[in-house]
C-alpha cells in the first residue's frame, strides 16, 4: 500500500481484533524495539454463560450456563482482576513452549499446562451490560502481555457461568490513540493522492516518557 521498502510495526493484534497497530516508516523502523509500548487500552465485547476453547466467539463451545448475573455481581467480580494479578495465558496464543507456539499445539488437539504470568491491569470499566442477554462491553486499561480473552473468561469463571470475548478493539498503544489512526483502505486512498506525509505522526509522539536513556551503540545506530 505504502510502496516503501522500510516498514516495521510495534506489537501484534489477535485475528479478530481491530484498532491501533503502530507502523514505522523509513528510518523510524530503528525505534521499533525501543518504543515504550507497555500501556494498552482495549474495548471488548463479551458474552457471559458461554465458554469456548479459544476463549472467544470464534472457538468451539465447551459449555454453557443459564445462571443469571446481575450487574452488581459483575462489577464485584471484575474488581478482583484489577492491579497486579497472575494470569494463565490461553492455549490459542503465540507464546512459545519448547520451541512450539501454543496455538500450533492447540490446533493439533493438544493442551499443555501453562504457568501463570504476572500482568498488571489498571482498570476494568463495564461500559454496557444487559442482564437479560448477559452481553456487554468493557474497557480495559492494562500493561503489555495481558490477554483480554483470559480476563473475560476468568471473570466468567469467578461468576460461576463462564464467559467469552465477542469483539476486541485496541484504542491505545505506545503513545498512539485510535483517533490518530487510519484504516488500510484510508491509507491506500491517501497514498494514491500522494499525501502520505499528511498522515505520519512524529516519532517523539510514540515516546510516553520525557526522557529515555540509551547506550552509546544504540545512539549511533539510531542516528546513522
For each predicted feature, which ranges?
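A structural signal for short, well-ordered beta-strand segments
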Residues: 44-46, 124, 138, 168
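Glycine/acidic-rich beta-strand-loop module
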Residues: 6-36, 104
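Extended alpha-helical targeting/anchoring segments
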Residues: 93, 97-122
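Accessory RNA 3′-end/elbow-binding domains used by RNA modification enzymes
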Residues: 1-13, 72-76, 135, 139, ...
Amino acid at each position: 500500500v505504502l510502496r516503501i521498502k522500510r516498514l516495521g510495526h510495534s506489537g501484534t493484534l489477535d485475528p479478530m481484533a481491530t484498532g491501533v497497530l503502530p507502523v514505522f516508516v523509513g528510518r523510524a523502523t530503528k525505534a521499533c524495539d525501543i518504543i515504550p509500548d507497555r500501556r494498552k487500552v482495549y474495548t471488548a465485547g463479551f458474552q457471559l454463560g458461554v465458554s469456548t476453547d479459544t476463549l472467544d466467539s470464534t472457538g468451539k463451545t465447551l459449555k454453557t450456563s443459564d445462571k443469571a448475573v446481575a450487574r452488581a455481581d459483575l462489577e464485584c467480580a471484575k474488581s478482583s482482576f484489577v492491579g497486579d494479578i497472575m494470569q494463565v495465558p490461553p492455549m490459542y496464543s503465540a507464546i512459545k513452549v519448547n520451541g512450539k507456539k501454543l496455538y500450533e499445539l492447540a490446533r493439533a488437539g493438544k493442551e499443555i499446562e501453562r504457568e501463570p504470568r504476572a500482568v498488571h491491569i489498571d482498570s476494568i470499566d463495564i461500559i454496557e451490560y444487559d442482564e437479560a442477554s448477559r452481553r456487554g462491553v468493557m474497557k480495559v486499561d492494562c500493561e503489555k502481555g495481558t490477554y483480554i480473552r483470559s480476563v473475560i473468561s476468568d471473570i466468567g469463571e469467578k461468576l460461576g457461568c463462564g464467559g467469552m470475548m465477542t469483539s476486541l478493539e485496541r484504542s491505545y498503544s505506545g503513545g498512539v490513540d485510535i483517533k490518530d489512526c487510519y484504516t488500510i483502505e484510508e491509507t491506500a486512498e491517501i497514498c494514491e493522492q500522494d499525501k502520505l506525509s499528511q498522515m505520519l505522526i512524529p516519532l517523539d509522539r510514540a515516546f510516553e516518557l520525557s526522557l529515555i536513556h540509551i547506550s552509546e551503540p544504540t545512539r549511533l545506530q539510531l542516528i546513522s
